[in-house]
Curated annotation (Swiss-Prot):
Record-given protein name: 3-isopropylmalate dehydrogenase
Family according to the record: Belongs to the isocitrate and isopropylmalate dehydrogenases family. LeuB type 1 subfamily.
Residues annotated to bind Mg(2+): D216, D240, D244
Cofactor: Mg(2+); Mn(2+)
GO MF, one annotated term: 3-isopropylmalate dehydrogenase activity
Length: 345
């Protein structure tokens, strides 16, 4: 059965890295007999330029009917003072598709260990996933700003916590069978509920070990002993901070993919880096995050584990051969890096 993939190339280096990702997908698809159609739609700044809105109606309708969505990058300086900004499109599509779970793998590549700000012994064996609740919590609560007083409401229901917990435990079943739930249970009421629901959900997964960490302790462990983690799950605010902290461990944003999942609808896959308008159009952008996002899509939306592993192994091999883009300390262009990965498939 042919799968429908909606592509949102967006802005800046987005079209360049999307082309790279689709080139790799095309090669892998021929090897694993994966049939798909691509439906390219404007989004972000490209949506504003085309139709005056970062999430045009036709783009949203296509996304809703897709089997998966690939997003490259959005934003740029031309929109800094605009009344409508590209980032509003990302918030809107998350809301419209109910993308409640953000998944960010954190892995250290042997060939890139020297880029990490941590000592080699600290990052040895680091391979974990941050699962962030994306649609609840303080970001979506009421925000009240008065003359000399302000407050923000942090609100979570047991059902919201339960669904993100179950997602984390299911991911852990396919990995190291360990979940670290992060909260601030010693202070916050929402965290007391968070921990209670985590304990309840853990009973549904007897093969997975659950541990609790306070967020301040977890932030320290992520630097002093990150290899301790397998699957980290936490609420929106803590996840926003900790996922960004974790992203510095590999020493570059250029090799980190991510996914955002709904309960029953399509998932969205994207690199964690931005649109890099300063190098757009020069053919020097690092496509690896986009290519690994394609691998995540194959595994998580289509259960094509073989295809995902082919891509991941090809990326490993390419880096080990010393083929590096400029952000990684080499001279390879976007096209050269992509061609090398395709060759190593």
């Amino acid at each position: 059965m042919t799968k429908k993939i909606v592509t949102l190339s967006g802005d800046g280096i987005g079209p360049e890295i999307m082309a790279a990702g689709l080139g790799v997908l095309d090669k892998v698809a021929s090897k694993i007999e994966f049939d798909y159609d691509v439906d390219a739609k404007p989004f972000g700044g490209a949506g504003i330029d085309a139709e005056g809105h970062p999430l045009p109606k036709a783009t949203l309708e296509a996304a809703k009917s897709a089997d998966a969505i690939l997003l490259a990058a959005i934003g740029g300086p031309k929109y800094d003072n605009a009344p409508v900004r590209p980032e509003q499109g990302l918030l809107a599509i998350r809301k419209e598709l109910n993308l409640f779970a953000n998944i960010r793998p954190v892995r250290i590549f042997d060939a890139l260990k020297h880029l990490s700000p941590l000592k080699p012994e600290r990052i040895e064996g680091v391979d974990f996933v941050v699962v962030r609740e994306l649609t609840g919590g303080i970001y979506f609560g009421e925000h009240i700003l008065e003359e000399d007083k302000a407050r923000d409401i942090n609100d979570y229901s047991a059902d919201e916590i339960r669904r993100i917990m179950r997602r984390a435990f299911k991911i852990a079943q396919g990995r190291g069978k360990k979940v670290t739930s992060i909260d601030k249970q010693n202070v916050l009421a929402t965290s007391k509920l968070w921990r209670k629901v985590a304990d309840e959900v853990s009973l549904e997964f007897p093969d997975v070990t659950l541990e609790h960490q306070l967020v301040d302790s977890a932030a320290m462990i992520m630097i002093t002993n990150p290899a301790r983690f397998d699957v980290v799950v936490t609420e929106n605010l803590f996840g926003d901070i900790l996922s960004d902290e974790s992203s510095v461990l590999p020493g570059t944003l250029g090799v980190m993919p991510s996914a955002s999942h709904s309960e029953n609808g399509p998932s969205l896959y994207e690199p964690i880096h931005g649109s890099a308008p300063d190098i757009a159009g020069q053919g020097i952008a690092n496509p690896i995050s986009m290519i690994l996002s394609v691998a995540m899509m194959l595994r998580e939306s289509f259960n094509e584990t073989e295809g995902a592993e082919l891509i991941e192994n090809a990326v490993d091999k390419t880096l080990n051969q010393g083929i590096l883009t400029r952000d990684l300390g080499g001279q390879a262009s976007t096209a050269e890096m992509t061609a090398a990965i395709i060759s190593n498939l």
